[in-house]
């Protein structure tokens, strides 16, 4: 059996027809769905841009139609009922009239939904969005195999087919394997409810991609500090310096304000709650951050939105001459690909966090700071940086001051020579 879609009609909006072949008998069936011929991918038999809202919705309908029709055909074969043009047209009409995709009990998608609901009070919005990405990917995979997946279908055969699907659709290996591991999480969730699954046979070694991490070195940060810039770029420059010496996410450092500053054992700190993790943080301020505050009349710079900030820090790095070439990933269409580009082009709001971890790793004792290059490392890093222990705060602040004074000393000696 094969099932595909084709367009017909002489108007701008074309009719989408379903072409079904069963035992060498062809059926051409009307679906009531329409699309512009220019927006149709003739090779993949679907909209070209399945990520644009209206075409994503249309593609979901096409995937749902395939799954429901195959389910209908299987039921008629079991019941030994005739499959003809009339019965197929009625089935398509019934499927198209349904407002929502059929959610079958104990299907993989229904269990993923149940898991998300179960975890809803314990996860942040970014985690919820990531779960939805996994859900949508499994939903798309079901359309690809034209079948509803149930727990008994999730095994090593499922893994092989899903990997093949992911590679055909040009998803990164990271996306493919993270989705598979999420499905394993769902199986463990189901097992706790007393349902037997194949989770134990799914011994999958996660294939790690060589991640291209871009950071600013101490010399490059100094170069940015010493670069004269137009007035409209000075706030972004100051925030970039702040991010490189606090190591926090954009959502946190852009909300820094004087009223969040506290004194602990004579050390100036900033006290805040991280937006993503909801963890309370007390962080001693590096002298470079204090200098930025003093330059801004004992205040933090004016806050910027993330689009403006990302645009301006690229320009700042370009003006500062941070332009050597490197390999980095850039989004083209709907997928990220590796390109050789100038470093300033790769700079985004997260570079301060990565630079902080990289520049201080090995110079400050690892119990205080760990290089944040991945999720597991970041968790350890956050664990220590979130400690409210006063000895930790004083110790980290002293290390900041010692390194800063040494740098000033070296710079002075260089000038004298």
Label each PLM-derived region with a short phrase.
Residues 173, 177, 200-250, 305-307:
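Basic, Lys/Arg- and aromatic-enriched nucleic-acid-binding interface segment
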Residues 188-197, 243-266:
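Short, charged phosphate-coordinating catalytic segments
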Residues 274-278, 366, 373-398:
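Catalytic-site neighborhood detector that most strongly recognizes the C-terminal catalytic loop/helix
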Residues 64-80, 106-135, 193-194:
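Short, aromatic/basic-rich helix-turn unit that serves as a nucleic-acid recognition element
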Residues 322, 398-417:
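C-terminal secondary-structure termini that scaffold catalytic or DNA-interacting sites
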Residues 255-292:
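Conserved tyrosine-mediated DNA breakage-rejoining catalytic core shared by Y-recombinases
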Residues 42-47, 113-126, 135-212, 226-227:
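N-terminal core-binding DNA-recognition domain of tyrosine recombinases/integrases
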Residues 299, 303, 314-371:
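Short, basic (Lys/Arg/His-rich) helix/loop patches that form interaction surfaces
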């Amino acid at each position: 059996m094969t099932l595909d879609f084709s367009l017909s009609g002489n108007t701008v909006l074309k009719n989408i027809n379903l072409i079904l072949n069963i035992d060498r008998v062809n059926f051409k069936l009307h679906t009531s769905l329409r699309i512009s011929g220019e927006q149709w991918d003739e090779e993949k038999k679907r909209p070209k841009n399945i990520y644009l809202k209206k075409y994503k919705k249309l593609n979901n309908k096409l995937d749902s139609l395939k799954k429901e029709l195959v389910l209908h055909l299987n039921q008629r074969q079991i019941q030994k009922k005739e499959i003809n043009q009339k019965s197929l047209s009625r089935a398509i009409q019934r499927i198209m009239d349904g407002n929502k995709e059929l959610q079958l009990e104990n299907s993989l998608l229904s269990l993923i939904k149940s898991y998300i609901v179960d975890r809803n009070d314990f996860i942040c919005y970014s985690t919820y969005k990531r779960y939805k990405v996994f859900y949508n990917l499994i939903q798309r995979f079901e359309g690809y195999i034209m079948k509803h997946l149930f727990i008994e279908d999730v095994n090593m055969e499922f893994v092989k087919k899903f990997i093949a699907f992911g590679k055909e659709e040009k998803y990164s290996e990271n996306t493919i394997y993270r989705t598979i591991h999420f499905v394993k999480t769902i199986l463990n969730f189901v097992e706790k409810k007393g349902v037997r699954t194949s989770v134990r046979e799914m011994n999958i070694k996660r294939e790690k991609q060589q991640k291209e991490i871009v950071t600013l070195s101490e010399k490059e940060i100094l170069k940015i500090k010493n670069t004269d810039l137009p007035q409209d770029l000075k706030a972004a420059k100051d925030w970039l310096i702040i991010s490189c010496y606090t190591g926090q996410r954009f959502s946190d450092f852009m909300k820094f304000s004087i009223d969040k500053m506290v004194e602990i054992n004579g050390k100036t700190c900033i006290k805040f709650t991280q937006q993503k993790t909801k963890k309370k943080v007390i962080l001693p301020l590096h002298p470079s951050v204090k200098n930025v505050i003093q330059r801004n009349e004992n205040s933090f710079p004016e806050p910027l939105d993330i689009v403006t900030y990302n645009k301006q820090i690229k320009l700042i790095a370009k003006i500062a001459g941070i332009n050597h070439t490197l390999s980095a990933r850039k989004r083209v269409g709907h997928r990220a690909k590796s390109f050789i580009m100038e470093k300033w082009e790769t700079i985004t709001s997260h570079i301060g966090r990565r630079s902080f971890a990289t520049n201080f790793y090995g110079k400050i004792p690892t119990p205080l700071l760990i290089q944040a290059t991945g999720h597991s490392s970041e968790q350890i890093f956050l664990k220590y940086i979130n400690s409210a222990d006063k000895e930790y705060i004083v110790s980290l602040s002293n290390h900041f001051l010692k390194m800063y004074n040494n740098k000033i000393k070296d710079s002075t000696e260089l000038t004298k020579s």
